[in-house]
Each structure stands twice: as structure tokens, then as C-alpha cells.
């Protein structure tokens, strides 16, 4: 059942969510109509009267109560509903979450005793209050997901318990520190995410050159971060494939213990570039991180082809910016800086992986671009052609 958080402040919408719709049971909300109708609990203040954490269910019952002691008189205009602590938790029944598939058996040792969050700000909207109530009332019965494209504030602290499963994060009782490098959240179960991306998801006609992918579609694809999701899966597969390190004399050797996962990582990146091709959807910064994976997996040609495609794209950006008047060029300084940074990264990656001749080829292209000379190269991109190469 999809819940639109922008509408969840409306009593009429909460009514709809609580009702059964076709084969979908109503969303588990404990508040009754008289407790959430228009003008009632439109916002709830947060007052740190106690430091100790309380169960989210207890706090929801406190907020829903009309007893005088559950109201705050600190504000003008009368009594206001409040939450007496920032620290909330949902208890976890370990046996239950294993039996109903919330957590896979191989991850059983990672299950926490309770999911803990800390509320931010000074108040909650009715929509935010309903989100907390849904999670508390559900009590691990049904899967609960948050969309990938939502802002972090909408996650209300549950992002520490996310599991990325494609276009959404599932709330699971496993704590994971966020990966700030990718501005992304959650852990990855490679078996689940691989099956979704490679077998279950239908990608439509994005890759059909006859289909026009306009700026709106570009933005949608960027917001959903599909390429980043493919990347994160491939990186996790590579990490799981190379888990054994041993010392031989003075040399540290990282051994590949699972070649199957290496092949899966390659297929994941290939699938990403097949379904969301460069000739349809513009390159983004995430694609730079595909290249080291191709190199590490022994796919030198694919690594070089992708690096060359990205080098051409960034060189074209520099060539365009260089053709502008000084005033217009100044407005694009950040784009110019990003392209220069990307090109330097491509050269460095190639050299680190022993592709010195190829690195020099990129360097020569950059120098030709910056000096205004035409770029000449006989290189043919067999794997990842770009629209700019065909024009």
C-alpha cells in the first residue's frame, strides 16, 4: 500500500489509508477519527521532560490521550499535545522477524533488541505523527518501505535501519551506519537486491534510441539514483568476493574467494549501462566508480571503454565552456571544475591499474581540448558508445 506523506496530514486521507482497498488491508494506524480530524493534533510539540527512551507505542498512546497531564500549557492559545521525550524505540521480536522474512536467516546475528530513533526539531506535523504511529502499530507484521527519492528529514531517523532493495529502503531491525560518500543509506542484502535489479525490475524503453529522454526524465532517473543503486550492489558483491587476506613473506595478498560474485558484479554494471545507456541518459559522477570495479574484475577493455566515454563527455563540456564569453564562462566555473576533476580522476585510475598508454591517451586529449586543437583518436568504443561519439 503506497502512502503519500504529503497528504497524510489530511484527515480524509488518513480515513482512506485505514480502509481496505482491493486486496490491500488498511494501513495500521491506531488513532481514531476523533483523535486526528481537522484541527486536532495538526502539530505536536517535543518537550524533553525525560531523557530515558520510551517505546513508540507508549508515546503514541500518550499523545492520543485527552487527559490533562498529556497537554502542554507553555504556549499561547491553549493546551497543546506534546511528546515528553526525544528518544523512542520499537522493540524487536527476533523470532517473528525471522519467520516473516523481515530479516534473512544469514543475517540473524545482526538483529538488534530494539530500533531506536531520536526526534529532531521542536515539533512534529500530523503527517510525521502518523508515520511514527504506523511503524509502532505495525509491530513488524508487514514490510514497511521508504522511497529512495525522499529527503532525509522524511526518514525521521529510521535511515539507520534501512535495507536498500531497489527503488525503496525497507525498515529492518539491523543498524547500519550511513555511507556519507554516496549520500545514501542502508545495508545491502546482495541476494535480494541482485534478484530485484537483474530479474524482477522491468526497465521499459529507456534504452530505445527512438524514445526521447527529456530533462524531466533525466531528473527522475537522477532522483531515484538507479545508477548508484547498481554501483552499490556491485561494490558489495566485490567486497563479499574478496574477504580473505593472507601474508606470504613480506607480501599481503588479497585472495578472491568467490569468483561467482565477481561475475555477478560485472553483470550488474553491464546491466546498468545496458538499461540506462550513455547514449540516452547523460553521464553522472557515480559512473566514475564503475571503472575501478571493471579493472579489479579483470575487465580491462570495459574499464577503458567506459573511461574513454566519460573522458569524451567531460572534454566536450570543457570545449563548450571554453567557447563562451568570459562572463558566461564564469557562470559555469563549477561545471568546468567538475569536468577537470573527473578527467584527472580518469587518468589516475588508468595509471593505478597499469593502463599507462591509455592514461596518456586521455591526457593528450585533455591537452588538445584545452589548447583548442581538434581531438584525434582511432579508439573505437565497443562496449559503451555515447551519443556525442555518433554525432
Where does each model-flagged region fall?
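ER/secretory pathway lumenal C-terminal domains and tails of membrane proteins involved
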Residues: 1-391
Amino acid at each position: 500500500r503506497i502512502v503519500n506523506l504529503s497528504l497524510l496530514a489530511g484527515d480524509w486521507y488518513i480515513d482512506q489509508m485505514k480502509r481496505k482497498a482491493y486486496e490491500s488491508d488498511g494501513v495500521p494506524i491506531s488513532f481514531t477519527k476523533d483523535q486526528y480530524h481537522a484541527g486536532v493534533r495538526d502539530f505536536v510539540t517535543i518537550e524533553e521532560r525525560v531523557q530515558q527512551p520510551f517505546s513508540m507505542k507508549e508515546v503514541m498512546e500518550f499523545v492520543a490521550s485527552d487527559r490533562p497531564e498529556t497537554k502542554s500549557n507553555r504556549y499561547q492559545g491553549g493546551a497543546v499535545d506534546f511528546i515528553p521525550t526525544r528518544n523512542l524505540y520499537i522493540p524487536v521480536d527476533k523470532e517473528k522477524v525471522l519467520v516473516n522474512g523481515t530479516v534473512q536467516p544469514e543475517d540473524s546475528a545482526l538483529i538488534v533488541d530494539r530500533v531506536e530513533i531520536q526526534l529532531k526539531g521542536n515539533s512534529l506535523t500530523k503527517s510525521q505523527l502518523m508515520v511514527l504511529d504506523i511503524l509502532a502499530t505495525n509491530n513488524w507484521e508487514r514490510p514497511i518501505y521508504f522511497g529512495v527519492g525522499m529527503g532525509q528529514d522524511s526518514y525521521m531517523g529510521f535511515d539507520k535501519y534501512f535495507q536498500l532493495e531497489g527503488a525503496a529502503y525497507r525498515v529492518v531491525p539491523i543498524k547500519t551506519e550511513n555511507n556519507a560518500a554516496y549520500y545514501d543509506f542502508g545495508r545491502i542484502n546482495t541476494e535480494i537486491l541482485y534478484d530485484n535489479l537483474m530479474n524482477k525490475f522491468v526497465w521499459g524503453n529507456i534504452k530505445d534510441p527512438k524514445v526521447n529522454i527529456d530533462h524531466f526524465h533525466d531528473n527522475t532517473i537522477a532522483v531515484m539514483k538507479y545508477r548508484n543503486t547498481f554501483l552499490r550492489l556491485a561494490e558489495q558483491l566485490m567486497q563479499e568476493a574478496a574477504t580473505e587476506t593472507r601474508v606470504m613473506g613480506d607480501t599481503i595478498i588479497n585472495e578472491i574467494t568467490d569468483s561467482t560474485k565477481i561475475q555477478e558484479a560485472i553483470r550488474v554494471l553491464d546491466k546498468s549501462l545496458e538499461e540506462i545507456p550513455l547514449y540516452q541518459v547523460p553521464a553522472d559522477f557515480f559512473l566514475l566508480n564503475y571503472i575501478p570495479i571493471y579493472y579489479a574484475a579483470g575487465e580491462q577493455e570495459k574499464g577503458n571503454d567506459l573511461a574513454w566515454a566519460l573522458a569524451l563527455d567531460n572534454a566536450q563540456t570543457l570545449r563548450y565552456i571554453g567557447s563562451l564569453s568570459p562572463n558566461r564562462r564564469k557562470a559555469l566555473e563549477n561545471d568546468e571544475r567538475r569536468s577537470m576533476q573527473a578527467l584527472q580522476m580518469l587518468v589516475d585510475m588508468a595509471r593505478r591499474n597499469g593502463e599507462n598508454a591509455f592514461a596518456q591517451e586521455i591526457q593528450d586529449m585533455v591537452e588538445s581540448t584545452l589548447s583548442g586543437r581538434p581531438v584525434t583518436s582511432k579508439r573505437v568504443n565497443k562496449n559503451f558508445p555515447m551519443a556525442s561519439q555518433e554525432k
